[in-house]
Amino acid sequence: STRKESSAASDVYKRQDGTPLYGTYDKMGEPLIYTKDIPSGNYTSELEGYRMNKFEVAENSYSSSNTDIPVFRYAEIMMMKAECLLRTGKSGAGTLVTQVRQRAFKDNPELATVTDSQLAGNTCYQYGYVEDYKIVDRGNTDPVQFGRMYDELGWEFAWEMHRRRDAIRFGIYTTKSWLSHKPEGDYRSVFPIPETVLTSNPNLEQNPNYL
């Protein structure tokens, strides 16, 4: 088990014996001492901020686990239909997304409601390349079509291996900057074919713009 100690600088999580809770090592080879603090209020370094653990992990599990995670769930079917309705100009997307959101707003059900027009609006995310906790290059600032729908997908399916595909589908992956990501061209929307596969099958050609 762990406990938290507060100091003037931050809260540091420690083991029962009083030693700091170490995880991995930073790029300089120094052990990371985790803290929940976010200095800028928006962005974190490798050791800052809360740790994500969406699905229950068995006690004392480390690099491997037999924890079952959903690969495909009913909420995804509803969100797929909602996105299709939006893209084809039909009504009903808001009703479907509201149904999905209701699980997270049981105590305040009125907060779950979202409308078709809201889903068709821009994203709430502040895009831009980040250095030292500040956006130094906003890059492309054009509104994102169906941006709120994109936000809803990110909130509902966080840590479920969806986001890259969503970003490509909404035209964000190859146009927007965020954190340490800068767009590098449309060819990045597909992965390169592994060299071993190309070598074993001379009829295959590498995807464009990959060496």
Regions found by a protein language model. Give the residues of each.
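Flexible, polar/acidic helix-loop-strand segments at domain edges
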Residues: 7-73
